Amino acid sequence: MDNRTAFLNTVAQALGRPLRREPQAEAAPVNNYANERLTELSPQQRCDAFVQFASEVMLAQCELTHEAQAPEAALRLCQQLGQQPVVVSGDSRLAELGITERLQRECNAVVWDPVRGAENIVQAEQAKVGVVYAEYGLTESGGVVLFSAPERGRSISLLPESSIFVLRKSSILPRVAQLAQVLHQKAQAGERMPSCINIISGPSSTADIELIKVVGVHGPVKAVYLIIEDC
């Protein structure tokens, strides 16, 4: 008998049972909330819950529009938030919606261009409004998900005074578990993962001091979710 077995025998005797060489099977979980919570909601119910939580708890402004009205809605929001200067993500989906061209024409918006390097960061720092396209929304937390890429710099939604997140209603997921499933499927399919995945829940805020919530401490003071009704 080696020292390890002798030691374990002593512990087992003290516990009043024989030495176990195989771990006991884990008890069946009481629930599977991590994967199933909020999945029973319809797309409309998810959107309603997302808007309610984001606006009431995360203090984000939520606006719904249709694809045809998206450029006008984005322009109106930029005007409310200070209009100029505006920096827009180089995301082709914003261009396809007509948002990029409209803001360039009406607000002299600058489009993030990886060729310009650090100049992009300076422009984002000086901008009143940053406009980005969100990959997903998360019902449970009222947050939006951003995938970084050379044409979609993180600074666009971090440095300007206000941020506008363009989000499709059909892309609102129940919670982060479903986002993990999407990422896993992409990885299994051999797709290249984004260099940075950000989950942003409303404007920057903190409640570290005496549990008093203060907004705009270390990032945008205002966050607007422009939700396109596509389902």
Where are these regions (language model features)?
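The feature marks the mature, well-folded catalytic cores of soluble enzymes
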Residues: 1-231
